[in-house]
């Protein structure tokens, strides 16, 4: 036997073909959501309140401080919130202190600041009763970026940008004449020396001393019209505020507020970290030749002589001195924006390309501390110095698609930014109220208006592009949605603007973002998925784990380091499949490794790190595809995406050929019931499981509290699939923390089970599997193999109207007793009733305007009190294709104290459940991107059968394999067959699964033929087919594209208001568009009358269609068609352009067109009791 047995959960053993031992457990897969939100509750909120306090009024006399905050208990549980359509939230209370500096009076109060949405245990939010997910956003990190550009004459230049988290941008660029310019906040460009003068370096000499003499600087100084700090300030002010009279004071305060005011300019932690990293002198001196001797100022010791090349060793030696004191200079700017001195660090080096001894100044920003969040003059000088250095080939340009320069904004940060907007709006209100209200009687509660805060949070959860309705089709879809990374959204890219480079796979994605899982279509590459082992660090950069190689011994240790893309660029990393000895020594001398995006073969001494696992490259969904290594990447992409569309089946099976990821994915998805404390199972029911806890007391294990775990039974998911949990433990089982107690939807025995294992043959059959179509045995219908349950929710509300309240009642005008047989006395359908299209669910009547009655009618009304004319029937009926069994009915009444929207008195919800067997037209797929539509369901007896008489279940077209290059399905087929004969389950992990020899070995062990094919007999004739056929077990899933949802036919329905043509689409009960090309086809056939009918009475000849309906009802001949409405619209449009357009007959008389507002059609419609509906488009 090849492979070894591995236990997954309590119930499932698989034979695993993995050769590489896993050093690291997979992390919790939804940690990206939960930990980010936890950070927000613990620190993010506190940061916000610290940033904003104190709020002072304009005189500085009153000051309002936020001291502490606390979250209360939520009003309802998560399940109750879903039922009542409310938000799962907890009240946020803030302790506020108001200080009156004149009187010294201090008032403290607890202020309620709205209900704050809470995250559920599974990483989602319940907003207005619907589960939503906040997707993480990939954005450019705030930092300073340098990039090369080539102008139209082929001359190389550079551009640089300092991008803050919020605030004004600073951009540098060169032009064709070698002048360096700066743009402040996207305005017109100025020579860069103007900015330096404005900072207080007024004379040419000071600037030259700072940056070192070079021709770029002299060109720029020539171009610069200013010659003093004052002139430079005025020049900048004129650019930023054109049209306002410039003064030096105004210019200073403008620059200070633009760049040096922490409230207006914020780099955030990550921006400060990136800028320090980029501009710090130690990173810029690497491999450069010194042009001065470095001396320790304290001892006078020479650390490095002039002309020394600073390699890694030398740099490491002088690093402590660099951090401390070498090259520190204090610049003393005069009269500029900057008050006080500027600390700089400057060292001279030789330019690498110069023949002579051209000296360059390298200016560092003297490593500003982490808590300075705004930009400093030191940063500006260092960034300009870096720019000049680049012109002499010192320094690197940046790649903005590198993951070291893109970071994630997860839930916590997105919420914090939104909360900040709300607080700053509130701050304005507080300031205004401080100056208006009486200072003595004022209280914190009276100052604070919480509306803007609540509004900004509501707006974010309700309508932000990143707050999405959770994809709940199956557990894998849920999990993937929570791990999604989007480059779209506010502050991100747009689909139209995003180029090819942003979407492409980049070498830094390795182990961080999945190169396979991304949507097809306009969003390709903009929406990605987090790799299986990846984590997000405090700065929002994605890290991936590597095993450290001990530099002394060269052994691979068990120690794991998480590296960001930036850090990884400094190391040589070996692949996970390198052969190791027991101790962890590399067995090969030459090793395939990666270094900065290049694959290199290098000596084992040079290796710094090694991959943790082969599946660290791919995401959770991609890691569920067995034999991924044998599939073409385009098809693997489809396979990963289609698994997310699998409909939960009534009785699912986990795959015979799996990858070992099924257990982890199912457990972390949040669909299963997980045990929270170790204990023993005391009771198991369909709806709950009781676990008695084990507690340690004095070293003894004793029984403690009882935990009751409730199951969700037949709940409608967001996508209308059925969400149902079933217990998989028995009474007396001892369970541990984290064990699965109950399967969720699409799970079996604790493993993900999206489809079923079926017997598949690759063969054609009478051409029915042309173009990827699938032929299926009727057994799969009869035995409910692919039967799924779907639940649809319908609601009806009784509102107050101008003419009186609507009423939910059994007494409906013009409806026979037969139609009411399933309604109870309230007029609401009973649970368990079977309903068909058009049946009543909720009887409801709406008052209609009373017309003037004649005397006789009034008399009748007085005698019989006949009410039929005053109300019209607005009952809720079952729509087309919606029939089924009533699963549940919920009634909410205003009188009973239920929270309902304004104007609604009663709300009724009915849930209809359908059991959908598989049928022709349904879409199915394997896990390798092999999808198809069922074209024929054959009786079992007509299916080809194996020599032992077993009919096969599905026939696939063999031509679907070679051109698509997804050979994984063939390997899965053969291995699955062998596993079925052996009665085992198999795990073949991604990139480390069964090799060819393993597959053949298992086939031999199972006693199958040595070509793994078999003779098949035709079920109709009993004759064997000419050739042997590949038959085996394949895992097939039923996708959420079902024919029942797509089939649609229109009778008389709504029309568009302007053109009077039928609407389009199933949702509007619309028609099929008969377009230009279809008209050509009928013209070609000479079918003139058919065509005229289609273009007039079946479409927009308003009078004609009513008359035609009348003629059909009365059995008369259909009248002549009239003028289509769209023709009248065309004429009106031409007339609106000022053209005189008339319709003339052949004898030059004008034809009068009657207007649509003709009562004729409405009268004839009334006679026939037809409702003529018109709808706005």
From Swiss-Prot:
<dbReference type="Pfam" id="PF04561">
    <property type="entry name" value="RNA_pol_Rpb2_2"/>
</dbReference>
<feature type="compositionally biased region" description="Acidic residues">
    <location>
        <begin position="1147"/>
        <end position="1161"/>
    </location>
</feature>
<dbReference type="InterPro" id="IPR007645">
    <property type="entry name" value="RNA_pol_Rpb2_3"/>
</dbReference>
<dbReference type="Pfam" id="PF10385">
    <property type="entry name" value="RNA_pol_Rpb2_45"/>
</dbReference>
<dbReference type="InterPro" id="IPR042107">
    <property type="entry name" value="DNA-dir_RNA_pol_bsu_ext_1_sf"/>
</dbReference>
<dbReference type="InterPro" id="IPR014724">
    <property type="entry name" value="RNA_pol_RPB2_OB-fold"/>
</dbReference>
<comment type="similarity">
    <text>Belongs to the RNA polymerase beta chain family.</text>
</comment>
<dbReference type="GO" id="GO:0000428">
    <property type="term" value="C:DNA-directed RNA polymerase complex"/>
</dbReference>
<dbReference type="Pfam" id="PF04563">
    <property type="entry name" value="RNA_pol_Rpb2_1"/>
</dbReference>
<dbReference type="InterPro" id="IPR037033">
    <property type="entry name" value="DNA-dir_RNAP_su2_hyb_sf"/>
</dbReference>
<feature type="compositionally biased region" description="Basic and acidic residues">
    <location>
        <begin position="1162"/>
        <end position="1177"/>
    </location>
</feature>
<dbReference type="InterPro" id="IPR010243">
    <property type="entry name" value="RNA_pol_bsu_bac"/>
</dbReference>
<dbReference type="GO" id="GO:0006351">
    <property type="term" value="P:DNA-templated transcription"/>
</dbReference>
<keyword id="KW-0548">Nucleotidyltransferase</keyword>
<comment type="function">
    <text>DNA-dependent RNA polymerase catalyzes the transcription of DNA into RNA using the four ribonucleoside triphosphates as substrates.</text>
</comment>
<protein>
    <recommendedName>
        <fullName>DNA-directed RNA polymerase subunit beta</fullName>
        <ecNumber>2.7.7.6</ecNumber>
    </recommendedName>
</protein>
<dbReference type="InterPro" id="IPR019462">
    <property type="entry name" value="DNA-dir_RNA_pol_bsu_external_1"/>
</dbReference>
<dbReference type="InterPro" id="IPR007644">
    <property type="entry name" value="RNA_pol_bsu_protrusion"/>
</dbReference>
<dbReference type="InterPro" id="IPR007121">
    <property type="entry name" value="RNA_pol_bsu_CS"/>
</dbReference>
<dbReference type="InterPro" id="IPR007641">
    <property type="entry name" value="RNA_pol_Rpb2_7"/>
</dbReference>
<feature type="region of interest" description="Disordered">
    <location>
        <begin position="1147"/>
        <end position="1177"/>
    </location>
</feature>
<dbReference type="Pfam" id="PF00562">
    <property type="entry name" value="RNA_pol_Rpb2_6"/>
</dbReference>
<dbReference type="InterPro" id="IPR015712">
    <property type="entry name" value="DNA-dir_RNA_pol_su2"/>
</dbReference>
<dbReference type="GO" id="GO:0003899">
    <property type="term" value="F:DNA-directed RNA polymerase activity"/>
</dbReference>
<comment type="subunit">
    <text>The RNAP catalytic core consists of 2 alpha, 1 beta, 1 beta' and 1 omega subunit. When a sigma factor is associated with the core the holoenzyme is formed, which can initiate transcription.</text>
</comment>
<dbReference type="InterPro" id="IPR007120">
    <property type="entry name" value="DNA-dir_RNAP_su2_dom"/>
</dbReference>
<dbReference type="GO" id="GO:0032549">
    <property type="term" value="F:ribonucleoside binding"/>
</dbReference>
<keyword id="KW-0808">Transferase</keyword>
<keyword id="KW-0804">Transcription</keyword>
<dbReference type="Pfam" id="PF04560">
    <property type="entry name" value="RNA_pol_Rpb2_7"/>
</dbReference>
<keyword id="KW-0240">DNA-directed RNA polymerase</keyword>
<dbReference type="InterPro" id="IPR007642">
    <property type="entry name" value="RNA_pol_Rpb2_2"/>
</dbReference>
<dbReference type="InterPro" id="IPR037034">
    <property type="entry name" value="RNA_pol_Rpb2_2_sf"/>
</dbReference>
<dbReference type="GO" id="GO:0003677">
    <property type="term" value="F:DNA binding"/>
</dbReference>
<dbReference type="Pfam" id="PF04565">
    <property type="entry name" value="RNA_pol_Rpb2_3"/>
</dbReference>
